[in-house]
A protein has these predicted regions:
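Short hydrophobic alpha-helical runs that function as membrane-insertion/retention elements
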Residues: 77-80, 135-137
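Nucleotide phosphate-binding/pyrophosphate-handling subdomain across enzymes
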Residues: 43-44, 208-210
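ATP-dependent carboxylate-amine ligase catalytic core
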Residues: 1-73, 81-108, 116-121
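Internal gly/pro-rich beta-alpha loop/helix module
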Residues: 87-207
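Phosphate-binding active sites in nucleotide-utilizing proteins
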Residues: 212-214
Length: 214
């Protein structure tokens, strides 16, 4: 959806501009074309989902959800699951997401807020019972949390020491998440057709007004 705060964080973290993709505003074909155009000559494009994977319009429809966008762009999904305080119950939780995945787009799982010792136990158990790869975990880093306020996160430039914190977070995650495995998953993504003409959408204007509607 339309969001300006997340792109600011992306620019701060990886030093490149990111853009919004929204199947509600631009439809499936136009969204696919915009995705291909913005990807350019880069080897990989990373899409950050919003809300829950299947939460679309009104929170009750698939249209407009992160899953719908993945369908439109044929993007493999890495599902991040918050498992803090959970035991074996995380297996049926993941199984439920897989059963909803009619297009078989979920290709890997990352377990969030989990200890190294418990990960060593749960990873083989999950992979034994479910047809999915567990590609890593993120430890519960209590001293690292992004601040928030009404209507969302604070701006990245308002957070003291954000670059140092993100560097530390990156160093930690590269130890616990198999990035090479995620790259391999991305390399097997289906090929999309080349970009054709992108329809120019004029801004709406209120009746009798000369300025676009906001």
């Amino acid at each position: 959806g339309p969001d300006y705060i997340d792109p600011m964080f992306h620019r701060t973290v990886i030093g490149v501009l990111s853009r919004n993709l929204d199947t509600f505003f631009t439809g499936e074909e136009q969204t696919r074309k915009l995705f291909l155009k913005d990807r350019g000559e880069n080897d990989f494009a990373v899409i950050e989902g919003v809300m829950g994977l299947y939460d679309g319009l009104g929170g009750i429809r698939k249209e407009g959800s992160s899953y719908h966008l993945a369908e439109v762009t044929k993007t493999p999904i890495i599902l991040v699951v918050d498992v803090k305080g959970m035991g074996r119950s995380m297996i049926p939780l993941i199984a439920g997401f897989l059963s909803y995945d009619k297009a078989h787009l979920i290709k890997g799982v990352i377990l969030n807020r989990m200890s190294a010792m418990y990960y060593a136990t749960m990873k083989p158990l999950i992979e034994e019972e479910l047809p999915i790869k567990v590609v890593g975990y993120v430890p519960d880093m209590k001293d690292f949390a992004l601040q928030s306020r009404h209507l969302g996160l604070v701006m990245p430039e308002e957070i003291t020491g954000i670059r140092e914190d993100l560097k530390r977070l990156t160093e930690e995650i590269t130890k616990t998440v198999c990035v090479d495995e995620i790259v391999t998953i991305a390399e097997h993504a289906p090929v999309l057709n080349d970009v054709t003409d992108i329809q120019k959408i004029e801004p709406l204007k209120a009746d009798g007004a000369g300025q676009p509607m906001i």
